Amino acid sequence: MAKKSTGAAEGEAKAPAVAAVAPVAKSSSKKKVESGILYVQSTYNNTMCLLTDASGNALASSSAGALGFKGAKKGTPFAAAKVGDVLATKGQLFGLKEVAVVIKGVGSGRESAVRSFITKGINILSVKDVTPVPHNGPRPPRARRV
């Protein structure tokens, strides 16, 4: 039984068909946003911030862990200030002038993240605290004795 020939010599490989790819047009500039909403979630272990436009579409986000802080250092006010500093810089790239702040959580970085926005020159319109408070739910964890 002889092998059937496929048309190409045995040592040759067929050249793949190359499709013409149109270059993707990049937007020349980011969208300009005058006012936005800053969500700050501060826990005992970390501080996370989200910057959105007025309708709630996310523009930028950051956290203490994303900036390289590890372990117990993530929950410090210094780490939260750095998170706010990074987001304020990103917000200025979008042309952000004023934010409404929504704070959630009981961590130590609640205020220092917001203060870094003030030092960058971004106006604070309002501060809203939406920390969930139980109506006598489950028993809370015991207080630490240090």
Protein language model annotation of sequence segments:
Residues 2-146:
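Ribosome-associated RNA-binding proteins
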